[in-house]
Amino acid sequence: MDIKQLLLSIILTVSVVNGRGRRINIYGAENGKSDIVQLRGPAEQLVYSSPIRERRPIFRNALLSNSPLRWSKMQDLDGNYLIPYVISGNYDTVERDTIKTAMEKIANNTCIRLIPRTNQPDYAEINNKKGQGCYASIGRFPGKNVVMLESNDDQSCIQEDTVIHELFHVIGLWHEHMRADRDAFINVLYKNIEPAQYPQFEKLSSRDATTYSVPYDYNSVMHYDENAFAKPGKISMMTKDSKFQKVIGHPKDASSNDYKKVCAIYHCSKCMHQDFQQIVEQEHIELNNPIITNAPVQQGDSCTDRLGICPMLKSREMLNCKVMATFCCSSCSAPTSTTTTTSGTPSDGSLWQRIKSIFQ
């Protein structure tokens, strides 16, 4: 093989590995307002005038193991939880293989199995639309659950770690830096962040957050990088342990702690090819959760919303109370005339118009 053939071979190999387009930074402005559907709404969805929150949304590091948002309706004969999916986007063979590899890694390390959809009413739809970036909703909502993985000659979400990250959102994981204990591990530099982006750095109280006592993990595939949503030339986060400053947000794969939290959500019998109960006992993972019933939460003659997005959905006329009453009791019970509306109604071409079918 002469030098020209060798160089051509290297170029072709790199092209196949990198796929189409440049990598989309899921933690930057180029990816829209967030890679989580519930955080992609207008900034007024959560009201912030400072790093101190003015009202408390119900966000968690990981879903409770008895959350109604788990994919718990279907199991196979081995007790694995099934998430039906369809790939409706246009992807090439290499990209489809990358998506399938990400699914296989999750299956090999947890009790979650992503299976091709037949006629199941609740499912994940993996789609590819130019200009949409990478995003997914947290947990299972009725009907279609969008997993947007844009890929074209300009830019792409199809890297194994990014696909795993978005699938973990669907399964039930939020971002690592949102944990209640994050201040012991990182400093969020609010002076370097536009106020409209403060919701991306919401810290949860220990009463709200569920970490299952799994240690904070700089290597998590769910961790933001140091520049996430920062002003140009600035960083938004500084790690307390300096050797991890350039590590956060740059994983090549899910960490063992990521898999442990998924296993905790679904009470898997096996986790990373080990008996999960042994892992629980050895690492003191906490599986006990507050009881969540399937009925609306009643307080006297009133009831409360169990999802922080309920008021926003109602104000946008996107709240379908036939299917969401269990989660949005207060918003569904309140007269429409008393609902606080938000200025700046989205146009027909806005993101919320495009994704509102998720909630209907």
Swiss-Prot record:
Its EC number is 3.4.24.-. Binds 1 zinc ion per subunit. Its cofactor is Zn(2+). Keywords: Disulfide bond, Glycoprotein, Hydrolase, Metal-binding, Metalloprotease, Protease, Secreted, Signal, Zinc, Zymogen. Residues 299-336 form the PLAC domain. It is an enzyme of class 3 (hydrolase). Gene3D superfamilies: Collagenase (Catalytic Domain). Residues 61-269 form the Peptidase M12A domain. GO terms for cellular component: extracellular region. One of its GO terms (molecular function) is zinc ion binding. Disulfide bonds join C111-C268, C134-C157. It is found in: Secreted. Glycans are attached at N108. Zn(2+) binds at H165, H169, H175. One of its GO terms (biological process) is nematode pharyngeal pumping. The active site is at E166. Residues 1-21 form the signal peptide. InterPro entries: Astacin-like_dom, MetalloPept_cat_dom_sf, Peptidase_M12A, Peptidase_Metallo, PLAC. Metalloprotease. This is Zinc metalloproteinase nas-5. The lineage of its organism: Eukaryota, Metazoa, Ecdysozoa, Nematoda, Chromadorea.
